[in-house]
Curated annotation (Swiss-Prot):
Cofactor annotation: Zn(2+)
Record text on cofactor binding: Binds 1 zinc ion per subunit.
Pfam families registered for this protein in UniProt: DALR_2, tRNA-synt_1e
Single GO molecular function: ATP binding
Binding-site positions, ATP: K259
A Gene Ontology BP annotation from the UniProt entry: cysteinyl-tRNA aminoacylation
Name assigned to this protein: Cysteine--tRNA ligase
Broad enzyme group: ligase
Swiss-Prot/TrEMBL catalytic activity: tRNA(Cys) + L-cysteine + ATP = L-cysteinyl-tRNA(Cys) + AMP + diphosphate
Gene coding for it: cysS
The entry's keywords: Aminoacyl-tRNA synthetase, ATP-binding, Cytoplasm, Ligase, Metal-binding, Nucleotide-binding, Protein biosynthesis, Zinc
Motif interval(s): 'HIGH' region: 26-36
Annotated localization: Cytoplasm
Recorded GO CC terms: cytosol
Length: 462
């Protein structure tokens, strides 16, 4: 696999068997938005491709569970910090399961690594990289000769992203430990960690050595990732990561989607109208480094492309595909899966991979038109679809249930009851009643398909 490193702007070849990946996860004070979803599904695709390649992958995604935004929410509510963060961690993980994001091997929470953070600050203090102000302990960026080597911009370009509420030595200096009487005891005074320190301590505790890949949204490149890299370089005496990957923004009306801009579109809102697989397909449909503008019509088009996969599955009578063995050994046998894997190994070239997937679906249908009773052909297509589902992370559902998505239990019972009444009417040659029932269901966007094995139904797209 070759990946474009954000630091060097060059494609770097991954030629190791064992791969370590750390993805910056959410700050858990609210429901996750589509920006969070995109980062998760993009790097879940990376993980799936590596697993399909035969790599052994150690994957961590953290939770920032102590932060000014969480404390603000706590002050506005009657809940404890733990109650707030636990609720939103569960909410986030529910969203990730719906999007078919594989569960990380490690899910560190910042509050579980306070001692490791203090140890890191002690190392930095011992070597003269820190100083004290009235509100906390700060990192002196002027002492790090390689500062800004990750974001590759001069300080003037980056400085607009920084706040300078206290009189720091340098505008780019950042807090390592915030004094706060309500939190943790330390030799520096009671307080809590700075955001940039949290990730470094968690990475060092879990992986101990230089990461193969550090991933996150492009908005984290500066200052967050730059400041992480500086602390690891100066405190741990090593590179934090060999490859840095950053996914592009999700935008609404040309602006970055962000809770702070009040233009967030929550994952849960999207999932009220679209199933998780359709949302995953949409979020993967442009290259991970690209920005894209959220569009309902684009999401609907992604759903239509996904429909074609399930039409083929339905034609083959292919049921649910298990995702269980993805984390174990996956053997890629089909030619189409090998071709798509080769494409994705070039910096996750998703557009080319999805175009080839579309061609495969079309060609498979043409072959089945010619040889509808060819069992070997059908089995080969089924195996290919199963392998492709495990690579892309969509196409797992039972096809019949896929086309019935969004129908409640009560509605389902009513539909089945009407279908039985229609079947009975047809037996009695009461075609007026049978047609009336079909029209009644059609008005509710339910379409009926009469087959040799009985009548099946689907929910039509809005």
């Amino acid at each position: 696999m070759r990946l474009l490193d954000s630091a060097t702007k060059e494609k770097i070849k991954l030629d190791k068997k064992d791969i370590s990946i750390y993805l910056c996860g959410p700050t858990v004070y609210d429901d996750a938005h589509l920006g969070h979803a995109r980062s998760s599904v993009c790097f879940d695709l990376l993980r799936r491709v590596l697993l399909a390649n035969g790599n052994r992958v150690k994957f961590a995604r953290n939770y920032t569970d102590i932060d000014d935004k969480i404390l603000k929410k706590m002050a506005q509510s009657c809940q404890t910090l733990e109650e707030i963060t636990e609720f939103y961690i569960k909410s986030y993980e529910e969203d990730m399961r719906t999007l078919n994001v594989l569960d990380p091997d490690f899910k560190p929470r910042a509050t579980h690594y306070i001692i490791a953070m203090l140890d890191l600050i002690k190392k930095l203090a011992k070597d003269g990289f820190v100083y004290t102000l009235e509100d906390g302990i700060y990192f002196d960026t002027s002492k790090d000769e390689k500062y800004l080597s990750l974001s590759s911009r001069n300080l003037e370009e980056n400085i607009s992203r920084l706040s300078n509420e206290v009189q720091k030595r340098n505008e780019s200096d950042f807090v390592l430990w915030k004094f706060d009487e309500n939190f943790y005891e330390s030799e520096f005074g009671k307080g809590r960690p700075g955001w940039h320190t949290e990730c470094v301590a968690m990475i060092d505790s879990i992986f101990e050595n230089t990461l193969d890949i550090h991933a996150g949204g492009i908005d984290l490149l500066f200052p967050h990732h730059e400041n992480e890299a500086a602390q690891c370089r100066c405190g741990c005496k090593r590179k934090l990561a060999n490859i840095w990957l950053h996914n592009g923004f999700v935008k609404i009306d040309g602006e970055k989607m962000s809770k702070s801009l009040n233009n967030s579109f929550f994952i849960k809102d999207a999932l009220k109208e679209f199933m998780g697989e359709a949302l995953r397909f949409y979020l993967l449909s442009s290259h991970y480094r690209s920005h894209f503008n959220y569009s309902l019509s684009d999401l609907e088009n992604a759903k239509k492309r996904l429909d074609k996969i399930y039409r083929l599955k339905k034609r083959l009578d292919l049921g649910e595909i298990s995702d269980f063995d993805v984390l174990n050994d996956i053997e890629i046998k089909s030619e189409i899966a090998k071709q798509i894997l080769e494409i994705l190994n070039d910096d996750l070239n998703i557009s080319k991979a999805l175009a080839l997937l579309d061609d495969f679906i079309s060609n498979a249908n043409l072959e089945l038109d010619k040889e509808s009773k060819n069992k070997i052909l059908k089995q080969n297509i089924k195996e290919a679809l199963s392998e492709l589902a495990k690579i892309f992370g969509f196409g797992f559902m039972d096809a019949t249930l896929y086309f019935q998505w969004g129908v409640s239990k009560e509605e389902r019972e009513e539909i089945e009851k009407l279908i039985l009444e229609r079947t009975e009417a047809k037996k009695n040659k009461d075609f007026n009643t049978a047609d009336a029932i079909r029209e009644q269901l059609s008005s509710k966007k339910i379409t009926l398909l009469d087959t040799p094995n009985g009548t099946i139904w689907e929910k039509m797209n809005a």
